[in-house]
Amino acid sequence: MNGRLAGYRRVSRIKKWSYAAVVLLLIGIGSGLFYDPASGVFSGQQGIVTGENLPGAKRHAILTLGDGTEIDLKDEVARMNLSKRQEAPHVGEGALSYRSVTDSVQLSEYHTLQVPRGGEYVLVLADGSEVLLNAESKLTFPVVFREKERRVYLEGEAYFKVKKNPACPFFVEVKPLEVEVTGTTFGIRAYPDETDVLTTLETGTVRVRNGEAEVNLSPDRQAIFDRSTTTLSVGEVDTDLFLAWKDGRIIFDDCPLEKILAEIGRWYDLDIFYAREEVRSYRFSLNIKRHETFGEVLKLLEAAGQIGFEVNGNTIVVR
C-alpha cells in the first residue's frame, strides 16, 4: 500500500493551461506572463529569484487512539509499539489501513488521524473506503463499523472514495453540516478559519444537510455553506479546480495573492508576512506540481516583476 489513493483519474479537464509546459501569471487586468519550465524562459519582465528551496508536502500524521495515546507515524519505535495493540492498523508508506482490524475491538473505539501543516496522509477505513487527508486536517472514525451506518467526523480538507453499501449508509459530519454519501468520490473543504464549507462531487451522489435545509448533488456540482449567513447553495463547478490537490497539483484561477500564499503556507508549513499591504490583492493564476520545492514557486511568482520574497527558515516576507 502506498501513500496515494489508487485508481483515480489524473487532472484532465482544465483546458486553460498546458500542465507540462505553461504557467500563466496574471496581475491586475490585462497583464500577464508565461513561463516555460522546459526551457526556463519567461516571456515578459524577468523576475529575480530569491529564497531557499523548501520541501513540499510530506506524508506525516499523528494518530490518537481511543485511550488518548498519541502515535507519531513518522517514529519507527512508536509504529512498532502500535503494531502490538489489538486495534492496530497496518502502517504503510504514508498510509494507514484498518482493513485487517478484527471485530473483537471494543464497540466504542474511535481513533483520530491528524495531519499537521505541511503534511498529507492516506487512510483506509475498515470498510475499504479511502480518505486522503490534506494538510492541517483531522478525521475521527470508528476502528470497526458495527452500526447500521458508517459515520466519520472531519475538520479541514479531505478527498473520499466511499465503498458502496446501501444497507449501511456513509455519513461525514462537518460542523454544522452532515453529508450523506453513496458509493461516491468527492471532496470536502471545511477549515475553521474559512467562511465557506465546500462539498465538491466528482462521481456518484451526496446529500448535504444543515438542519432542515438540504441539497442533493450530482457530479460536477458543489454545495456551498456560508457560515456567516448559514445559507446553503449549489453551483456547477469544474471539479479539477477544487480537487486537483489530490493528484499532486496546485491550481489557482485568478486568485488574490493572499489566498494563494495562505494555501501554499498550509501545504509547505510556512508563515507568511507582507511588507506591502497592496500586494495581498494582486491576482495570479497558477498551475504547478504540488510537490515542487517552494523555491520553484517563488521563481514563478517573482517572474511577474512586481513582488519579491525574503526567506528565513519557514518564514516568508512578501515585498
Predicted regions and their residues:
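Gram-positive cell-envelope targeting signals
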Residues: 1-4, 22, 36-37
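Positively biased amphipathic helices and basic secretion/translocation or surface-docking motifs
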Residues: 1-18
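A residue-level detector for the "anchor" residue at the start of short, highly conserved motifs
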Residues: 13-20, 30-319
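Active-site-proximal cofactor/substrate-binding loop regions of enzyme domains
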Residues: 26
